[in-house]
Amino acid sequence: MTSHFVTRDGSTWMPQYLTAIDAMTCIGCGRCFKVCSREVMHLHGIDESGEILGACDGEDDDFAGELSRTIMVVDHAGRCIGCGACARVCPKNCQTHVAADEIVA
């Protein structure tokens, strides 16, 4: 079932839900996190082999010495409301969004 909504000006709009962030493209800038009111994604550390180590909270992370870089990771996809704010601010276009009827449970 596809959900369509009508905006105030009468045009239709269909939510596109965040399902993934490309770890090879993401630069970990955090812009998407800042505009997301639902805390769908968080900053994670990644090592040189590409393994995601865990969430970075800015405190004393156990793996701080192992970090090669940081990336955004979808931690709570079910919280996404499909507004697309994260996609609009992403400088690398590294996110995948899909309509509700395309999401496999």
From Swiss-Prot:
Cofactor binding notes: Binds 2 [4Fe-4S] clusters.
Binding sites annotated in the UniProt record for [4Fe-4S] cluster 1: C26, C29, C32, C36
GO biological process terms, semicolon-separated: nitrogen fixation
GO molecular function, one term: metal ion binding
Binding site for [4Fe-4S] cluster 2: C80, C83, C86, C90
Pfam families named in the record: Fer4_7 (PF12838)
Entry keyword set: 4Fe-4S, Electron transport, Iron, Iron-sulfur, Metal-binding, Nitrogen fixation, Plasmid, Repeat, Transport
Keyword Iron-sulfur carried by entry: yes
Record field: transmembrane: none
Domain of life the protein comes from: Bacteria
Cofactor: [4Fe-4S] cluster
Positions of the 4Fe-4S ferredoxin-type domain: 17-46, 70-100
Cited Gene3D superfamilies: 3.30.70.20
Function, as annotated: Ferredoxins are iron-sulfur proteins that transfer electrons in a wide variety of metabolic reactions.
UniProt name for this protein: Putative ferredoxin-3
Lineage start: Bacteria, Pseudomonadati, Pseudomonadota, Alphaproteobacteria, Hyphomicrobiales
